Amino acid sequence: MKIGLCESRVKEIRQAYEVGFDFVEVSNWAVYTMEDSKYEDMIKLSKELPEGFMYACNGLVPPDFRLTGPDVNYDTIRDFAEKSFAKLAKLGIKMLVFGSSKAKIVPEGFDFDEAMGQLIKVTQIFGEVAEKNGQRVCIEPLRTEECNIINTAEDSVKLAKDTGCANVGGHVDYYHLMQNGEKMSKLEGLAKDIVHTHIASPCKRNIPTVDDGADYGQFFNYLRKGGYDATVSFEGGGDKTPENLTALCAYLRSL
């Protein structure tokens, strides 16, 4: 399995490569709002690093976008996707992680089924635009405290299938899975429809370590039993020194 780090700054991306990560996952919103000079620095760096090192992105839409509710504007969403996905493509980004909790939250009193229909259409737009750029979209399920729709790996896989887009797939995040109290064993049956994953410690969303009490091996074992052996990114906080990141990279490879 390829091991990645969520990071959008040039210095830290270079450090991720130097300590042994296989790829980085940048923030779409960070890239989209970069000053031109900084974006050019990112393009230059992407050409200096091995092809595919800038592999994924998260933060797909800004929090003030509305993807559910009465204020959804599909033209605005498509326009943003067209512009931002193209900028990502110039960096070599191939996997787009669609979490975006604040933008997805269903407003109080709004019909849930209608909101789900909106998300299907939004994800179809993302899938169509991504396909033109040679990219895939994965739908990240989020803990219930953070979002009130698309909370489980089952939700993620179902939404991906409902779009009818071949380049849209499921996702699972160890931290969100554990926060929701979900059963790890279900991943074996879902793995064939998952295309990317995240990991972080289940309590403080920090760097996973061998002695933090979490059973990360079980997470990987169920995914591999189901046929998944693609990519996992560390998405979380903690003291990201070169020493700690080197240890993290080695630890995740050992699982």
Place the predicted regions along the sequence by residue.
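Active-site-proximal loop/turn and secondary-structure-junction residues that shape catalytic pockets
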Residues: 9-11, 28-30, 60-63, 102-104, ...
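Active-site acidic/histidine proton-transfer and metal-coordination neighborhood
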Residues: 67-169
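Short glycine/serine/threonine/alanine-rich loop segments
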Residues: 21, 51-52, 93, 135
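Glycine-rich, proline-tolerant flexible connector loops at the mouths of alpha/beta enzymes
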Residues: 25-49, 100-107
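Histidine-acidic metal/acid-base catalytic patches
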Residues: 1-4, 9-20, 78-79, 83-86, ...
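A generic structural signal for well-ordered alpha-helical segments
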Residues: 46-50, 88, 130, 223
